Amino acid sequence: MDVTHDIPRDRPVARKVETLRPLQWLKKGFRDFQKAPADCLFYGAVFVLMGYLLTLYSEHSPELVITFATIFLLAGPFLAIGLYDIAKQMEAFDGHGRVKLAHSLSAWRVNLPAFTLYAALLAVLVFGWFRVSLLMFALFYDTAALPSLNDIVVNAFNPDNIAFLVAYFAVGFLFAQVVFSVSVVSIPLMLDKEVDTVTAMIASVQAVLKNLLTMGIWAAIIVALSAVGFVTYFLGLIIIMPVLALASWHAYRDLITFER
């Protein structure tokens, strides 16, 4: 059974949802995971592999930590495209059929121009954070050569360096907020209705602004579960990332409606 993609005639509009709605998204995401565990675990395994590569190649250099974290941020949403497609297939099948992994692997082709522009814009945002991070480290250490990762960990959490920690995490939080706001429902929207990148990002920001507390809870859930995945030496990501992606599809369905 092929999944069709509708050309939108209506404009996407954000709507208000219940404050604790993210808990329902998470529940639905786990339910979807149980319906197609093998397909979801394939994507989860890729996230785990990315985590190990990040650790392997960035153990002794902060530049590489940031670089590979950037790659993770850029590649992550595009891996999620396949999981969004799996969620969409489940909706289309309505329990009568099996999702196709091969279909999900090529889902990005349905709206290639929009996804390409999205990747470019996200790359600009993440590269901006990359440059700001290097600048802050350089100013903090006041040296031409960047410190080792061990030096950063040891010195950054020294009480004497509290000003650096506050500034670093404040700037990082700002960048994270921007990326979250423009992406929380934009990729599912671009996949589902084939809208352009700017329209999808605007709808995503509107969804966040209309549901500040709700989206704050959703962001906290994402961060908390991702942290669990990292502290389990990335093994937890094999389940956590697919569940979060599938849950994000349900978030999109709840947060976005269409009007003429």
Model-derived segments and spans:
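Hydrophobic alpha-helical membrane segments
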Residues: 1-260
